[in-house]
């Protein structure tokens, strides 16, 4: 069903290579049969992530808009989100029944956050390959995101990372905010994230 105040806007942030685009792909493929879904991607100089998602057939091409931000990627999702807000308006014009828009940030550091004017819910993706210490380094992405995704958990033995240490640090840094370990390549942990989005975003499956 269409949201009364427009589509639910879900921001997906995280460093380069953490798995943001793969998460966006998995969420769209899992949710597109129950909800009207669209994607807005952010890249500094290209529309590479939008093209990747189109090639992977996450959604039809008309449901994907690639935004070229220029400069620092966090500016387009926080200080001046107008380019992304315009893309949301355009996507809503194309699909008046839109339920949810995933807004994928360009790769950025742990200080990146979404403006509350742009995102209703935020997911922040980190990878175990970036180091066991990442959760305890903090930063708004780690501490304030609505759901922290700790991706590539399957690679922990190969990069000498103790997942129990990461779990304890994430729990301490995030207080009671939820987080989860994922292996997005194999789809592990995706359903937990979907359940979080549906419950906290007030989504209801559209009737046939």
Curated annotation (Swiss-Prot):
It is found in: Cytoplasm. The keyword Chaperone applies. The keyword Lipid metabolism does not apply. Pfam families: cobW (PF02492). It comes from the Bacteria. Its main location: cytoplasm. GO terms for biological process: urea catabolic process. GTP binds at residues 14-21. GO terms for cellular component: cytoplasm. GO terms for molecular function: GTP binding; GTPase activity; nickel cation binding. InterPro entries: CobW/HypB/UreG_nucleotide-bd, P-loop_NTPase, UreG. Keywords: Chaperone, Cytoplasm, GTP-binding, Nickel insertion, Nucleotide-binding. SUPFAM superfamilies: P-loop containing nucleoside triphosphate hydrolases. PANTHER family: UREASE ACCESSORY PROTEIN G. Belongs to the SIMIBI class G3E GTPase family. UreG subfamily. Homodimer. UreD, UreF and UreG form a complex that acts as a GTP-hydrolysis-dependent molecular chaperone, activating the urease apoprotein by helping to assemble the nickel containing metallocenter of UreC. The UreE protein probably delivers the nickel. Facilitates the functional incorporation of the urease nickel metallocenter. This process requires GTP hydrolysis, probably effectuated by UreG. This is Urease accessory protein UreG 1. The lineage of its organism: Bacteria, Pseudomonadati, Pseudomonadota, Alphaproteobacteria, Hyphomicrobiales.
């Amino acid at each position: 069903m269409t949201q009364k105040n427009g589509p639910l806007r879900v921001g997906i942030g995280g460093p380069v290579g953490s798995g943001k685009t793969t998460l966006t792909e998995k969420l769209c493929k899992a949710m597109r049969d129950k909800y009207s879904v669209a994607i807005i991607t952010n890249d500094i100089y290209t529309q590479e992530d939008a093209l990747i998602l189109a090639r992977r057939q996450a959604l039809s091409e008309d449901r994907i808009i690639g935004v070229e931000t220029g400069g620092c990627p966090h500016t387009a999702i926080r200080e001046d989100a107008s380019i992304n807000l315009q893309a949301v308006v355009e996507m809503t014009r194309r699909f008046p029944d839109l339920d949810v828009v995933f807004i994928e940030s360009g790769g950025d550091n742990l200080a990146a956050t979404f403006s509350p004017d742009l995102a209703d819910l935020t997911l922040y993706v980190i990878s175990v390959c970036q180091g066991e210490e990442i959760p305890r380094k903090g930063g708004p992405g780690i501490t304030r995101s609505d759901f922290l995704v700790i991706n590539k958990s399957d690679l922990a033995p190969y990069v000498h990372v103790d997942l129990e240490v990461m779990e304890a640090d994430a729990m301490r840094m995030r207080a009671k905010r939820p987080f989860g370990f994922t292996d997005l390549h194999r789809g592990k942990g995706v359903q937990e994230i979907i359940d979080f989005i549906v419950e906290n975003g007030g989504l209801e499956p559209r009737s046939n």
